[in-house]
UniProtKB/Swiss-Prot annotation:
Coiled coil: none
Classification of source organism: Eukaryota, Metazoa, Chordata, Craniata, Vertebrata
Assembly notes: Along with COA3, core component of the MITRAC (mitochondrial translation regulation assembly intermediate of cytochrome c oxidase complex) complex.
Membrane topology: Single-pass membrane protein
One GO CC term on file: mitochondrial outer membrane
Mitochondrial intermembrane compartment segments: 1-14
Protein name: Cytochrome c oxidase assembly protein COX14
Length: 57
């Protein structure tokens, strides 16, 4: 039977590991969202350029 200190240590390590995983996952989600935003902005800019050039012709 583990002692109270061992149980507390296990709980702390489990909690710390879950917080670390959540932080990594949050960073991943943030970077994916930023990448998609930049891709969309680039596509919109390219579409605007194409519209300008087609209007000139």
């Amino acid at each position: 039977m583990p002692s109270a200190k061992q149980l507390a240590d296990i709980g702390y390590k489990t909690f710390s590991a879950s917080m670390m995983l959540l932080t990594v996952y949050g960073g991943y989600l943030c970077s994916v969202r930023a990448y998609r935003y930049l891709q969309l902005r680039s596509a919109r800019r390219q579409a605007a350029e194409e519209q300008k050039t087609s209007g000139v012709l």
